[in-house]
């Protein structure tokens, strides 16, 4: 009976919100980000070039906890065309809270790319140009200067490089991984690949200057993401093992090690709407759909966009677009908070993630894993999300 009432209310509110549709914003906020949970990582590859026996084995559960978890781990930065990258910067801070500069510290830039000068500090461009595997897909390789070809060594992306629909490249740091191994710093990864760490820390900021022009090439059935550009973050283990596996055991992604889409065009009917989405199990069962902001950022197809994402120390994650985005070596806490505060409330969409409780066992193994989400938790997440969207529509 209660479930029927809940679903009826959900349908009514969803109909009301859907009638108006998602709105355009300059800033997409998520609060209460981070929970205690676990995922399974790849422990062993087997026969990775054999069509019949290619497979992967997973190890014990890896537990995580705290603000922004599991995205407090090392992350790689991914780009899909049509896109032209002009600047990229990664920052960390000893402590930063959105809207509270008094208790926040400045941001220090630890990685930087600028296209016209070909500056590339602590940046390595990779793509999926390596050896093919029937269960793992293509391995990582160094990207050539055009982003899509392969190179024999680390190469800086050329100025003005435009990648087309479906084409991707990745940015990792220039810090080399230790030897492949389940208990090593980078986990198990494929032999022969250029293996680097991503960018870590609970409190971090990724900034971008970029273009997302309308695709000029003709569409075809071989293009999976036609005119759907994106910038997103993945747990850095994923691409080193398999970003696009045919076997779910060949990547920690399916068990929830972490993805955050900063700016992503989701489908052809909304190709100029850039959404932010969490692909974690923080209150939802459908990892593929994820936890998406109901609002979107408008894609500028004729000019340059500046913006990025802030992961603060208190579990707030903010995607934003602003022409005032700085790329200095040091950015003060006041500068970041003033930039975010300058975006009006009616240009801000806020979502709160669910609180999830789980306790890591004293000894962990695959059999000790717990179900992190229940059906009722998923229902309550949708109620909260729909209610938030309904409230936003009423206030506009």
Swiss-Prot record:
It holds the Pfam family YJL171C_Tos1_N. It is an enzyme of class 3 (hydrolase). Keywords: Cell membrane, Cell wall biogenesis/degradation, Glycoprotein, Glycosidase, GPI-anchor, Hydrolase, Lipoprotein, Membrane, Signal. It is a lipid-anchor; GPI-anchor. A lipid is attached at residue 368 (GPI-anchor amidated asparagine). GO terms for molecular function: hydrolase activity, acting on glycosyl bonds. Residues 1-19 form the signal peptide. GO terms for cellular component: endoplasmic reticulum; fungal-type cell wall; mitochondrion; plasma membrane; side of membrane. One of its GO terms (biological process) is cell wall organization. Disulfide bonds: none annotated. Induction: Induced in response to cell wall damage and DNA replication stress. Its main location: membrane. Its EC number is 3.2.1.39. Extensively N-glycosylated. A motif (ExDxxE motif) lies at residues 259-264. The keyword Ribonucleoprotein does not apply. Glycans are attached at residues 51, 99, 122, 146, 174, 219, 249, 267, 300, 328, 346. It is found in: Cell membrane. Residues 369-396 form a propeptide. The conserved ExDxxE motif might be important for catalytic activity. Probable circularly permuted 1,3-beta-glucanase involved in cell wall modification through beta-1,3-glucan network alterations such as increased branching or remodeling. Belongs to the PGA52 family. Present with 5525 molecules/cell in log phase SD medium. This is Probable circularly permuted 1,3-beta-glucanase YJL171C. It comes from Saccharomyces cerevisiae (strain ATCC 204508 / S288c).
